[in-house]
Amino acid sequence: DENDPDSIDLKQVPNNATVYEISGPLFFGAADKILDIKLKEKYNVLILRMRSVTALDATALHFLEQFYERCQKKGITLVLSHVNEQPMNAMKKAGFDTLIGEENICLHIDDALNRAKELV
């Protein structure tokens, strides 16, 4: 969206990174879509932008954990951007924040892009 100052089209994404944005709540009915994200060998960082995810249930968290494991096996660091309050609370309760590493959970897309640059 050209009116969005945080549009990824206006950002410089490092060559080693790719960005996926998830929109809407992640519940069991839509959560498996996370596993549809293709992992490409040319990237060593995948930024999952979650600014529009207002809620996350246990099933979605399970799929997110599976996706994290797939990334790990391919040597890709998963970085989360703009995780809202309820999803963050669910992640903390399940220990996902510790699993992924708190340094890989960023408040803003700019922070996530800077984290990707650190991981070149």
Regions found by a protein language model. Give the residues of each.
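The feature marks cytosolic C-terminal regulatory regions of anion transporters and related permeases
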Residues: 1-99, 117-120
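Short acidic-hydrophobic, aromatic-tinged amphipathic segments that line or gate anion-handling sites
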Residues: 99-115
